[in-house]
Amino acid sequence: SPVNTQARAMPAALYFDYLGVRLDGIRAQGKSLDLLIRLTDTQEGWELHLANSVLTAHRADRDRRAPLLTCTRLQMMALFEGRLTPEQAVQQGLLQNAAPVKELLSLLDSFRPDFQLVLP
């Protein structure tokens, strides 16, 4: 898939909001998920939480649990945008377990950032 240049300019908090917009609420019904992410380039910790068909993110800098995903912000974006598969991320030592990320990816809609606008 093409590189989403708009997303590359987003700080992590805004990018996680973007993922929340991509979440298909109907497919996410009844699903619950927690992903702890450590961004090595910005030294930020984040927890993604899926519940009630809503994906939220909050800072988790002091969380002592082992992160599921440890990578740079751009590597994380590549994973969530399909340019890096969960299996590749596991092989590269970035991702501890592919299953939770695969589940989240299955709940996200894909859309082109250059969609046409329909005007009245």
Predicted regions, residues:
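C-terminal interaction segments
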Residues: S1, D61-P120
